UniProtKB/Swiss-Prot annotation:
Gene: FBXO25
Role noted for this protein: Substrate-recognition component of the SCF (SKP1-CUL1-F-box protein)-type E3 ubiquitin ligase complex. May play a role in accumulation of expanded polyglutamine (polyQ) protein huntingtin (HTT).
GO terms under biological process: protein ubiquitination
Compartments (UniProt record): Nucleus
Listed GO MF terms: actin binding
Protein name: F-box only protein 25
Start and end residues of each stretch annotated as Interaction with beta-actin: 1-83
Gene Ontology cellular component annotations, sorted alphabetically: cytoplasm; nucleus; SCF ubiquitin ligase complex
Keywords: Actin-binding, Nucleus, Ubl conjugation pathway
Annotated source species: Bos taurus (Bovine)
PANTHER family, alphabetized: F-BOX ONLY PROTEIN 25, LD30288P
Pathway(s): Protein modification; protein ubiquitination
Entry remark concerning the domains of this protein: The F-box is necessary for the interaction with SKP1.
Length: 357
């Protein structure tokens, strides 16, 4: 399928339809196909082993090369996809670039489907999907919405398989189901892409995922070291590594020793100081009967009023020089003299704000 590229002077791209949507074919496969088409123009008949004896050595060699190219093309044509891990964020039309970049286009181009397999990017993608579910779901195109739910399906199946991060996905599905209920009940008040029955099916799918996660049973490891075998100081060190209070509470329910360590006032004080400032402490100060600060209660009280710091292993970055959004590990073709000075980390909320016009 021919498609006009980003530059109006380009010859255009070749695309192929797959399960994840339309994917652009690699440039070298197009050149190979072009060579084969040129060969077809000069020879309109099919050569077989019996006919080759009639032709000269030059024609025999040409026919042999042609068959090898045809065989190579058939073996590799389904694998020669090209996907850039960056996208140019333009907000206005120019002679070279028509239109502007949308949230849905960026969502499709940045390959979030592969990012969820990277443990460093998993939490980042989940948080982004959650923010989209809360406020930006209807702004996505039909293809982007389909891609959104395909990625979500892969995330749910991954969690059901490896039993990691179920709480994050439960929170995401809860927000998504609430949004879908509001959209379905208020049909006609907002513009929905697709038939209303599609949205009802999506809600039913989300409810089914929630039920599957609710029935998820953690398998106990029979062999090897467990948390109970570790010394107390190491268990305390593990708790101090957490940046989420709910993770500390959940881990404290495993053993009596961890329960005692999870109530450490110094632990919750460090957590409050990491996420919040002194002015916020003064506004929501909670004291015990003895006059001590209840840091654990303060953390959950402050969490209701202020956003906590977000921490991710790998995030998207924005290049101010090139106006390109990209994964830090993947990089992009930057033309700046000092590229590192032009890079800015992009939080999930900042990612969405980039496409608000």
């Amino acid at each position: 399928m021919p498609f006009l590229g980003q530059d109006w002077r380009s010859p255009g791209w070749s695309w192929m339809k797959t399960e994840d949507g339309w994917k652009r074919c690699d440039a070298w496969s197009q050149e190979l196909e072009g060579e084969n088409s040129q060969c077809d123009i000069g020879h309109g008949i099919i050569l077989n082993s019996e006919d080759e004896e009639i032709f000269s050595n030059e024609e025999h060699e040409f026919a042999s090369k042609k068959r090898k190219k045809d065989h190579f093309r058939n073996d590799t044509n389904t694998q020669c996809f090209y996907r850039e891990n960056w996208i140019y964020v333009h907000k206005e039309s120019t002679r070279e670039r028509h239109g502007y970049c949308t949230l849905g286009e960026a969502f499709n181009r940045l390959d979030f489907s592969s990012a969820i397999q990277d443990i460093r990017r998993f939490n980042y993608v989940v948080r982004l999907l959650q923010l989209i579910a809360k406020s930006q779901l209807t702004s996505l195109s039909g293809v982007a919405q389909k891609n959104y739910f395909n990625i979500l399906d892969k995330i749910v199946q991954k969690v059901l398989g490896d039993h990691q991060n179920p709480r994050l996905i439960k929170d995401l599905l809860q927000d998504l189901s609430s949004t879908l209920c509001i959209l379905i009940r208020g049909v006609g008040k907002s513009v929905l892409v697709g038939n209303i029955n599609i949205w009802i099916c999506r809600l039913e799918t989300v409810l089914r995922w929630q039920q599957q996660l609710q029935n998820l049973q953690m398998t106990e490891v029979d062999s090897g070291l467990t948390l109970s075998d570790l010394p107390v100081h190491m268990l305390s060190n593990i708790l101090y590594r957490f940046s989420d209070g709910w993770d500390i509470v959940t881990l404290g329910q495993v053993t009596p020793t961890l329960s005692a360590l999870s109530e450490d006032r110094q632990l919750w004080k460090k957590l409050c100081q990491y996420h919040f400032g002194e002015k916020q402490f003064c506004r929501h100060l909670i004291l015990s009967e003895k006059g001590h600060v209840e840091w654990k209660l303060m953390y959950f009280a402050l969490q209701k009023h202020y956003p906590t710091k977000e921490q991710y292993g790998d995030t998207l970055h924005f290049c101010r020089h090139c106006s390109i959004l990209f994964w830090k590990d993947s990089g992009h073709p930057c033309t700046a003299a000092d590229p590192d000075s032009c890079f800015t980390p992009v939080s999930p909320q900042h990612f969405i704000d980039l496409f608000k016009y």
